[in-house]
Amino acid sequence: MALDVQSDIVAYDAPKKDLYEIGEMPPLGHVPKEMYAWAIRRERHGEPDQAMQIEVVETPSIDSHEVLVLVMAAGVNYNGIWAGLGVPVSPFDGHKQPYHIAGSDASGIVWAVGDKVKRWKVGDEVVIHCNQDDGDDEECNGGDPMFSPTQRIWGYETPDGSFAQFTRVQAQQLMKRPKHLTWEEAACYTLTLATAYRMLFGHKPHDLKPGQNVLVWGASGGLGSYAIQLINTAGANAIGVISEEDKRDFVMGLGAKGVINRKDFKCWGQLPKVNSPEYNEWLKEARKFGKAIWDITGKGINVDMVFEHPGEATFPVSSLVVKKGGMVVICAGTTGFNCTFDVRYMWMHQKRLQGSHFANLKQASAANQLMIERRLDPCMSEVFPWAEIPAAHTKMYRNQHKPGNMAVLVQAPRTGLRTFADVLEAGRKA
């Protein structure tokens, strides 16, 4: 392991120990034998308060192309809930390890680097994108790494995510941290932003173009809030769908052309049997929803793209309202996985159904650059202390979270800090 400790960080005094308390800083580059982590075990599968428990575990070792990052803050995503529940699959079925540390977003400090790592050094401030691969197949070398047979999501399909004092990542996962953001702001956006970026720009020829119209489900949530901003930045028009009227101003403030409250309509859930009385009633309501879109886009102008992630509850409507030759792009199924649709509208109107999963490094970096250039807002809604990581996930699971993205503090002792020096100073005053 190479330990290049030349950095811009001012020297500070700290004892060398085998375990540090949360918020306590080791000497730069010193890797303790153990660390605190919120661990999930197979026998605890269930809701977050049951599944996630604090444990003292071994600090991960790294190989030649890996990096150890001291985690300042982490983001809260739905895959942490899935990992805890063991639904739709248990992470243990994949990585076979005795415990699982969730967390697929983080900001932090490079703490140790493998001897083949050239682009990063100890002391660098970074954010982490969550795609990993083995790097040795044709998709990783000239294709799209997201299609690699070894592609996996760090913190969900790997056991060593960000809800711990240290995390092990591949060097290619690291990106520069936007210096104008706090540690917690920098920790909350990478997974959702990069996912939204690929959905909108990653599936040619249906990549988003200026002037096009996009329907965005869950427009006030973490994923939707970035979709609205990216669509607006690209010179296209976002039509946001909300479920609570008090979220309208938030979505319009992000740059949406218009907002629709889905509770004004009754066409949700699985598609009724085609041509049944229930189907006819569903179609009448779905067309009312389509007319609400026209109130924003203009009469007869259907959306070019539907930004899908609820899945089961909304998919029948999504596949109906997208225009001829348009695309429904979907990255999740937060309301259920049994997606139904009337295939007649699909083949006759030659619509595209496109699955989308996170992003490759080029896409994640392009999205991150927009954040560095201050073209996007991280839309951080709430920050939780280390001790409340399960509570943050429970809030998301029960759909009680505020509009935007949630973050949790790990080694950062409080909110509002922007540099490592800030962290050290806050630690001395604590």
From Swiss-Prot:
One Pfam family named in its UniProt record: ADH_N
Matches recorded under CDD domains: crotonyl_coA_red
Function description: Catalyzes the NADPH-dependent reductive carboxylation of crotonyl-CoA ((2E)-butenoyl-CoA) to (2S)-ethylmalonyl-CoA, in the presence of CO2. This is a key reaction in the ethylmalonyl-CoA pathway for acetyl-CoA assimilation required for R.sphaeroides growth on acetate as sole carbon source. Is also able to accept acryloyl-CoA as an alternative substrate, yielding (2S)-methylmalonyl-CoA. To a lesser extent, when CO2 is absent, the enzyme also catalyzes the reduction of crotonyl-CoA to butanoyl-CoA.
Keyword vocabulary terms for this entry: NADP, Oxidoreductase
GO molecular function, one term: crotonyl-CoA reductase activity
Induction of its expression: Down-regulated in cells grown photoheterotrophically with succinate.
Organism: Cereibacter sphaeroides (strain ATCC 17023 / DSM 158 / JCM 6121 / CCUG 31486 / LMG 2827 / NBRC 12203 / NCIMB 8253 / ATH 2.4.1.)
Catalytic reactions on record: (2S)-ethylmalonyl-CoA + NADP(+) = (2E)-butenoyl-CoA + CO2 + NADPH; (S)-methylmalonyl-CoA + NADP(+) = acryloyl-CoA + CO2 + NADPH; butanoyl-CoA + NADP(+) = (2E)-butenoyl-CoA + NADPH + H(+)
Cofactor binding, per record: Despite some sequence similarity to zinc-containing alcohol dehydrogenases, this enzyme does not bind any metals.
Assigned protein family: Belongs to the zinc-containing alcohol dehydrogenase family. Crotonyl-CoA carboxylase/reductase subfamily.
Enzyme kind, highest EC tier: oxidoreductase
Record note on pH: Optimum pH is 7.5-8.0.
Known partners and oligomeric status: Homodimer.
Deletion consequences: No effect during photoheterotrophic (anaerobic/light) growth on succinate or 3-hydroxypropionate, no growth on acetate under the same conditions.
Cross-referenced InterPro entries: ADH-like_C (IPR013149), ADH-like_N (IPR013154), Crot_CoA_red (IPR010085), GroES-like_sf (IPR011032), NAD(P)-bd_dom_sf (IPR036291), PKS_ER (IPR020843), Zinc-ADH_QOR/CCCR (IPR051603)
Enzyme Commission code(s) on record: 1.3.1.85
Name the UniProt record assigns to this protein: Crotonyl-CoA carboxylase/reductase
